[in-house]
Amino acid sequence: ITAYVYEKFMNVTYEPEKREGILFVGGFGHAPNLDAVQWFLDKIYPDVYKNIKANFYIVGSKAPDEITHITTEGVIVKGFVSEEELKQLYNSCRLVVVPLRYGAGVKGKVVEALYYGIPVVTTSVGAEGIGGIENIAIVEDQEQKLVNAICEVYQNDDKLIEMSEKSQRYVREKFSTEAVWDIVKEDFE
């Protein structure tokens, strides 16, 4: 049974022309998140920024100095934010990246992004435990493929809209109270 259950849904009308930037969400008290951001900043973001000039918003509590003191052009470190500010970021950024290289289990940050209808680009580690995610998100592990995928989808309004619609439909089908009760019923039959 999933730990992520929603009673109400966002019904986001994704409007790419009103959105900008790439968002990462994850607490830095968890080592895989720090590794993910450092790897993204070192190996992926420079080429992404060179190609599409997209800002990179970093959200997460307990950000260490090496994150909070970043001066890289285009990088905006938000640190810890309120639920309201996080919701605003989900509703104003074009896509979420989850560049995890290690860690286990279903990633709440991926499910939450899908819930908000924001397109997701992740690694296979970020996709772990979310059946069928490759049909609604972009899953890549190789650095250059991640760069290419982010740049291509970021500039493709139709693809962004399609991914947003698919992610919201997926959350309704897999993470609604009804879906979870159906799983419980199946387990007891």
What are these regions (language model features)?
Residues G29-P32, G105, I138, R172:
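Glycosyltransferase donor-binding loop in the core domain
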Residues L34, K87, K107, I161:
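Glycine-rich phosphate-binding loop at the start of an alpha helix
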Residues N91-G105, I118-P119:
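Acidic donor-binding loop of glycosyltransferase active sites
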Residues K109-A113, P119-T122:
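Short hydrophobic beta-strand element within catalytic cores of glycosyltransferases
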Residues I136-Q144, E152-D157:
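Conserved acidic donor-binding segment of nucleotide-sugar-dependent glycosyltransferases
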Residues D158-F188:
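A charged, aromatic-enriched C-terminal amphipathic alpha-helix characteristic of glycosyltransferases
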